[in-house]
Amino acid sequence: MSGRRAATLAVYWAGSCGGCDVALLNIGERLLTLDREFEIAFWPCVADFRHEDLASRADGSVDLCLLNGAIRTRHDLEMARLLRRKSRLLVAFGSCAQEGCVPALANLAAVEALLAAVFLDGTTTVNPQGVVPGVPPEGSPLPALLDAVRSLDQVVAVDYVVPGCPPESGRVVEVLDLLSAVLAGERAFPEPGAVLGAGPTTVCEECPLERRELKVKRFLRPYEVVPDAVTCLLGQGLVCSGPATRGGCGALCPRVGIGCRGCYGPGEGVEDIGARLTAALAAVVDSGTATQLPDQLAAEVEAAMASVVDPAGTLYRYAMAHALRQAGRPGPGGPAGTVGHDAHRL
């Protein structure tokens, strides 16, 4: 690495929990060499960088930006656009930036309903005057909520994606090594839009559990069963998103008896992860025998699928911003409960 010009790096969090920044700091000894390869141009989570520090830079002067978090507020949107303008390479880092993640489950309701749930209807809410925050007045430093949570690629052009909630630390090191070498001219640029720090197959292909021909009558909550350490969790009645989720984490959750939650995003060719997961769950349902009447078979399948608690939060936990259908939100060109193709435009 001697003789290299230090590349400039920006890291920013939008609608995020901070876990992606922790993942960057959790890369072990590799962190010690980071400052030799990158000049930190902007990283407000870990140092006292201000908006003007970024705004005053020339456009395109930041070599690499890792942006984590969903686009929830007007300020998030403005920062995404600013960082896109200042950065040569913009990476959607982590599940929130990739697909909206848990914040995007808010897209199941209008903003007004969300505010009412938080400030008026909560079981522990004490708000006798019924004060509900409104749209900040013009010139207010408080950012307004957007009408929906967006992923980063729905508001600006994204060069690459690093999935995960948060990205696994070993994979973060791989991505930093790759992009550092790319910026130094030592390796070719990946294909535009490439998913970095992940595998080409699904979590199931990384999972050591045995996929047997087991059928279930209903799906269980984790507290209802102690799974054995050999058999596929789906076959034991536990919801697992492995069949539809991109690999790269090493199947960390299934290895310890917890179903995959889908944080590495959809596998290759999966357009809607919730639809693919629904099909995977239906495939393990014990739908009776061929001697039963069609109505009886349908009723058994319906009962089994109804045992999946919180279907939206289970099947679209990390992907609601990219869901083909989003309940409760009328969209251009579609009936209530759908989002049209132009719905992400602001």
Annotate each language-model stretch with its function.
Residues 69-72, 96-98, 167:
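Short glycine-rich anion-binding loops that position phosphate/pyrophosphate groups of nucleotides
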Residues 75-76, 100:
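Extracytoplasmic/secreted cell-surface and envelope-processing proteins
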